[in-house]
Amino acid sequence: MNLRTVALAGAVGLVLADSSIVVLALPEIFRQFDTSISGVSWVLIIFNLVLALLAVPAAHLARRFGPGRSAAVGLAFFAGGSLVCGLATGLGPLLTGRAVQAAGGAVAVVGALELMVSTFGDNRRAVATWVGAGAIGAAVGPGLGGLLTELVSWQSIFLVQVPVAIVAGVPLR
């Protein structure tokens, strides 16, 4: 497996881990921002909603601008959104950051799939790698989020993603 494939799998895993990484941090966010349960639930909802809604438009972007460039730009937006989340001082900025993360994540994940298909030349192997990376990310997300929240802070679950997204995006340019 070459560096580009590892970066692609890492990008998919990172984005899909983020779909669930906040679950165990929600009580801390709820307390810190003194918000309602429905308000704090949007921290989880907005990410998954935007990610799902932008998947098809992201595929059009990947075809128009190329999957490598799209995936790298998507990861840059994901990193920027993660930074906004990690520095958020209220629920509004946190939700904005989550929406930006998801928009970037949608573009990155779709671009990664197209790059994997072209890299492997075998759709089944590419899709299996893509799905496997996503499943691992989604499975690791809650535990990692809970650990970081307990040991450091809820903000750390977002701030740690910034350098990871940047490093994953470099080989994709």
Briefly describe each language-model feature range.
Residues 1-172:
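Transmembrane-helix bundle of Major Facilitator Superfamily
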